Swiss-Prot record:
This is Carnitine O-palmitoyltransferase 1, liver isoform. Its main location: mitochondrion. The chain crosses the membrane at residues 48-73, 103-122. It is a multi-pass membrane protein. The modification Phosphoserine is found at S741, S747. The modification 3'-nitrotyrosine is found at Y282, Y589. It comes from Equus caballus. SUPFAM superfamilies: CoA-dependent acyltransferases. The active site is at H473 (proton acceptor). Belongs to the carnitine/choline acetyltransferase family. One of its GO terms (cellular component) is mitochondrial outer membrane.
Length: 776
């Protein structure tokens, strides 16, 4: 192959006349440019490390402090209270340094020490200030004088122009709640779900735990919280994600959809060109820490940015007992899957990032490639979709050497994985339900052998130009991937754009080398394992009952006019819909974040409360008046917001109990209370997809550029998984999953109940269908 020859910098042959050395100037040029690129990235990382390391001060502030100290010394004023004189006396006892030199060195050393002390003081002061969360519990729209003063203090100590990781060392640690508080909150959460006898028994177990075993486990947990950066995150990653032996597909991975209505181009290669380039632009900003940290409360309170570190060049590696996460500092290629074949695509040429048209050129070459897959290659990715133990054993036995190892390394060490899907997906106005359901299922599992589910994310481009993403869950949570995806969709449409003929803008480049086809030698024994994994994955995928739909009746704009939280409104609608669907209440999981703390991830909001149950029962009781229902709605809504705030500020229930359970396992002691708590199924698992970069989309001028959000598979075999995104002011997109094998669930039936519940609750506020249209 021509590209293989181009990759060789020099060749030599031994002849009777000596050694004949032949140099490839093009290859040497590429090696030189690659080296310069690597050193440039190292320098930028070093520079960013220095800037982040001294934040909230700046490197230039060192010069200001030192000059200030030297100026006072010149004016015969001692700002050090004698410290400079002591430094002066200890500097040089041999007499080689002049007195003037010693004065200068002493002043610089003292100034540097003072500068470091100021940095530490500012950083610690900011950490103390950020430990205050009273602002979150204040009445909406009202801010006390104390909170305003606190905000001013935070802004003073926060420095200027923070980079992505600037606040990391200033974020407080996640606090460990008191055992009795957590136990009491737990009992309160399960009271509406248990009969009196069951609740009495659980209360006895809980009280015994809180008095006897709980304090012992708590002591070890507090010890860990003083030592570790976050007492939850490492155990959560290991025991909830990496030690899971079931398939990642459906059970753990989640997806993100493209824009709902718009397809900028129907050319698959062009969509891939712009999409890949946009992702790489985001990586470029991430490498330089140019992505702004997310700030709450009027750009005042920072969220933890640690999860961004492993977004690219990351892969989950299977193990027999536990998986590991492999993360590289850099990767200069991607791997593209098409029709059962794998291609390695270099991302740089002549020392620069490939342009969108050049990436499109690469992708078109792959689409036009007529070669057939090698034996076992077409279904190879099914290994990442099935059980983890067979994949781990197979990887060790058949992918540890030779061409298989080289090709697998190319996949696992790629910046990310790309799938050129052979199907057409997306919203179709003539059949919205079927088209959206098909789109969701394709992104969630595809054909089970055409996504590499171990990669941090797989970028999927469909035949008709629609795109999407499937993400692995262990390295980060959905809002982090959502941040990337918002940037990609915006950059694709508004920054990069397309030519009139649908191609990427710019010209093709005949000098860029062709993609490299990965080579495999897969024996029959390995092919048998692949088939077994594929069968497992197919059974799992075919059992997923998915329903994704846009809710057009109203959005968060009208909900806010009702003076209530949009999230609380939707959560109460979900409770009402579930009760109408099942005729009973269930343990409900709503994902909240704990990124107000360093290395925080998620916490559970137990959305099914006594207050929400009272409201739901009133809604199905024809004897209740609208006034009574509204009163119960407001009580339930306020309770939900309170529970959400507790979860965000480190006073949740489930992560604390989970960590206590882990400690009990390390100590080899059994806790009937913890065992029962952690075995309770979440039959309704919910999550809101946040919009984090609303400035990227001007929905007033471009109302058709609305996001579809994303979703995940059902958590319980007899339950529902519901994801939703509040887009703009007038649209809510829902993604509902369940299993066909459960006789109790039906995603489309639940969707109908949910639409009705949303409308029924809105009707309490006196908004008719006509008034809703006027609001639109």
């Amino acid at each position: 192959m021509a590209e293989a020859h181009q990759a060789v910098a020099f060749q030599f042959t031994v002849t009777p006349d000596g050694i004949d050395l032949r140099l490839s100037h093009e290859a040497l040029k590429q090696i030189c440019l690659s080296g310069l690129h690597s050193w440039k990235k190292k320098f930028i990382r070093f520079k960013n490390g220095v800037i982040t390391g001294v934040y909230p001060a700046s490197p230039s502030s060192w010069l200001i402090v030192v000059v200030g100290v030297m100026s006072t010394m010149y004016a015969k004023i001692d700002p050090s209270l004698g410290i400079i004189a002591k430094i002066n006396r200890t500097l040089d006892t041999t007499g080689y340094m002049s007195s003037q030199t010693k004065n200068i060195v002493s002043g610089v050393l003292f100034g540097t020490g003072l500068w470091v002390a100021l940095i530490i003081t500012m950083r610690y002061s900011l950490k103390v200030l950020l430990s205050y969360h009273g602002w979150m519990f204040a009445e909406h729209g009202k801010m006390s004088r104390a909170t305003r003063i606190w905000m001013c203090m935070v802004k003073i100590f926060s420095g200027r122009k923070p980079m992505l990781y600037s606040f990391q060392t200033s974020l407080p640690r996640l606090p460990v709640p008191a055992v009795k508080d957590t136990v009491n909150r737990y009992l309160e959460s399960v009271r509406p779900l248990m009969k009196d006898e069951d609740f009495k028994r659980m209360t006895a177990l809980a009280q015994d735990f809180a008095v006897n075993l709980g304090p012992r486990l708590q002591w070890y947990l507090k010890l860990k919280s003083w030592w570790a950066t976050n007492y939850v995150s490492d155990w959560w990653e290991e025991y909830v994600y990496l030690r899971g032996r079931g398939p990642l597909m459906v059970n753990s991975n989640y997806y993100a959809m493209d824009l709902l209505y718009v397809i900028p181009t129907h050319l698959q290669a062009a969509t891939a060109g712009n999409g890949i380039h946009a992702i790489l632009l985001y990586r470029h900003k991430l490498d330089r820490e140019e992505i702004k940290p997310i700030l709450f409360l009027g750009s005042t309170v920072p969220l933890c940015s640690a999860q961004w570190e492993r977004m690219f060049n990351t892969c989950r590696i299977p193990g027999e007992e536990t998986d590991t996460i492999q993360h590289l500092r850099d990767s200069k290629h991607i791997v593209v899957f098409h029709k059962g074949r794998y291609f390695k695509v270099w991302l740089y040429h002549d020392g620069r990032l490939l342009k969108p048209r050049e990436i499109e050129q690469h992708i078109q070459r792959i689409l036009d490639d007529p070669s057939e897959p090698h034996a076992g290659e077409a279904k190879l990715a099914a290994l990442t979709a099935g059980e983890r133990v067979p994949w781990a054993k197979c990887r060790q036995a058949y992918f540890g050497r030779g061409k298989n190892k080289q090709s697998l390394d190319a996949v696992e060490k790629a910046a990310f994985f790309v799938t050129l899907d052979e199907t057409e997906q997306g919203y179709r106005e003539e059949d919205p339900d079927a088209s959206m359901d098909s789109y969701a299922k394709s992104l969630l599992h595809g054909r089970c052998s055409d996504r590499w589910f171990d990669k941090s994310f797989t970028f999927i481009v469909f035949k008709n130009g629609k795109m999407g993403m499937n993400a692995e869950h262990s390295w980060a949570d959905a809002p982090v991937v959502g941040h990337l995806w918002e940037y990609v969709m915006s950059t694709d449409c508004f920054q990069l754009g397309y030519a009139e003929d649908g191609h990427c803008k710019g010209d093709t480049n005949p000098n860029i080398p062709y993609p490299t086809r990965l080579q495999w030698d897969i024996p029959e024994e390995c092919q048998d394992v692949i088939e077994t994994s594929l069968n497992t994955a197919n059974i799992l995928a075919s059992d997923v009952d998915f329903h994704s739909f846009p809710f057009h009746a109203f959005g968060k704009g009208l909900i806010k006019k009702c003076r209530t939280s949009p999230d609380a409104f939707v959560q109460l609608a979900l409770q009402l819909a579930h009760y109408k669907d099942m005729g009973k209440f269930c343990l409900t999981y709503e994902a909240s974040m704990t990124r107000l703390f360093r290395e925080g991830r998620t916490e559970t909001v137990r959305s099914c409360s006594s207050e929400s149950c009272n409201f739901v029962l009133a809604m199905v009781d024809p004897t209740q008046t609208v006034k009574q229902k509204l009163r119960l709605f407001k009580i339930a809504s306020e309770k939900h917001q309170h529970l959400y705030r507790l979860a965000m500020t480190g006073s949740g229930i489930d992560r604390h109990l989970f960590c206590l359970y882990v400690v009990s396992k390390y100590l080899a002691v059994d806790s009937p209370f913890l065992k029962e708590v952690l075995s309770e199924p979440w039959r309704l698992s919910t999550s809101q997809t946040p919009q984090q970069q609303v400035e990227l989309f001007d929905l007033e001028r471009n109302p058709e550029y609305v996001s579809s959000g994303g979703g995940f598979g059902p958590v319980a075999d007899d339950g529902y998984g519901v994801s939703y995104i509040l887009v703009g002011e007038n649209l809510i997109n829902f993604h509902i999953s369940s299993k066909f094998s459960s006789p109790e669930t039906d995603s489309h039936r639940f969707g109908k109940h949910l639409k009705q519940a949303m409308n029924d609750i809105m009707a309490l506020f006196g908004f008719s269908s006509n008034s809703r249209k006027e609001f639109h």
